[in-house]
Curated annotation (Swiss-Prot):
Keywords (A to Z) from UniProt: ATP-binding, Kinase, Magnesium, Metal-binding, Nucleotide-binding, Thiamine biosynthesis, Transferase
Gene (UniProt): thiM
Official protein name in the record: Hydroxyethylthiazole kinase
Enzyme class: transferase
Lineage of origin: Bacteria, Bacillati, Actinomycetota, Actinomycetes, Bifidobacteriales
Residue positions binding ATP: R132, S196
Pfam families in alphabetical order: HK
Metabolic or biological pathway, per its Swiss-Prot or TrEMBL entry: Cofactor biosynthesis; thiamine diphosphate biosynthesis; 4-methyl-5-(2-phosphoethyl)-thiazole from 5-(2-hydroxyethyl)-4-methylthiazole: step 1/1
Organism: Bifidobacterium adolescentis (strain ATCC 15703 / DSM 20083 / NCTC 11814 / E194a)
Keyword Transit peptide tagged: no
E.C. numbers: 2.7.1.50
One annotated GO molecular function: magnesium ion binding
Transport keyword on record: no
């Protein structure tokens, strides 16, 4: 924490914006459309509803593009792929970009497989507004897009499926570079990157925040990160990217802590998590620990 009054004032303003985002989602029930993986689609939709939003799930390019016209934001997750996705996802990303639509990307298992790599590489010039992933995915995406200077690239350990094998601290520089790249091409003139881990990180490329808290039980259910991406899109429908990424991450930290106390294992934890997403207050989210770092 900083003793600089200007820093404290800025953090206070940010907390107020986070509280407003949580309040607005529950008051406006914004639609966030998801093109997400088959394994976690149910949890993604239910989490968006529990957070206060509205969900729509689709895979056909013309359907996604049409729904994007009425959606507040969109979410693309590359966790499970079919052959036609190799052409469909780049087309969807290009149309979202051309139409000035905001969207969240979860680059699940970035660096594994030629098809996934080709899809993620195609997003470089028509990028999302927010990227949310684990440290290994963020480092891999930064490398794919060639954003680092040759002498400053932090090599990623080979991804272990959808699980991170890199620590969040190793992804700080990559996250900042990605966020600045997103901002340059964003329809709202800003972008953000959220890195999930033991202590989450969120950055817009200029300001960087660490978010202590959350529950290790999140790693014991499938779809925790995927559903967080969906809820991030829900918040992006009502807030600017940095606030949306922070609000969603903090909501999940608080909800997962509550769910862990109320559950006996992974099955009951998932149910308790949805209940907690519904019940956590805007004040609780905004009052969470937020540490601004360099």
């Amino acid at each position: 924490m900083s003793d600089d009054p200007s820093t404290n004032d800025a953090l206070g303003t940010l907390r107020a914006a986070i509280k407003q985002a949580v309040t607005d989602v529950r008051g406006q029930t914004p639609l966030a459309q998801s093109f997400t993986n088959f394994v976690t689609i149910n949890l993604v939709a239910n989490a968006q509803l529990a957070a206060g939003g509205t969900a729509a799930m689709s895979y056909l390019p013309d359907d996604v593009i049409a729904t994007a016209e009425i959606a507040g934001s969109n979410y693309i997750n590359v966790g499970t792929l079919l052959p036609f996705f190799k052409n469909a996802l780049p087309e969807i990303a290009r149309k979202l970009h051309e139409n000035g639509k905001t969207w969240v990307l979860d680059p699940v298992a970035a660096g594994i497989g030629e098809t996934r790599t080709a899809i993620l590489e195609s997003f470089r010039d028509v990028p999302p507004t927010i990227v949310r992933g684990n440290a290994s995915e963020i480092i891999a995406l930064d490398a794919m897009w060639g954003l680092a200077d040759a002498d400053s690239t932090t090599p990623a350990t080979r991804p272990a499926g959808v699980e991170a094998v890199d620590e969040v601290d190793a992804a700080v520089d990559a996250a900042k570079r990605l966020a600045r790249h997103l901002a340059k091409r964003s329809p709202v003139g800003a972008g953000a990157v959220a890195v999930s881990g033991a202590v989450d990180l969120v950055t817009d490329g200029e300001r960087t925040f660490r978010l202590p808290g959350g529950s290790a039980m999140m790693t014991k259910i499938t779809g925790a990160g995927c559903s967080l991406g969906g809820v991030t899109a829900t918040y992006l429908a009502v807030a600017e990217p940095l606030v949306a990424a922070l609000a969603a991450s903090l909501l999940y930290d608080r909800a997962s802590e509550i769910a862990e106390v109320k559950s006996d294992g992974p099955g009951s934890f998932q149910v308790a998590l949805l209940d907690a997403l519904w019940n956590v207050t805007a004040d609780q989210v905004a009052a969470s620990d937020i540490i601004e770092t360099n």
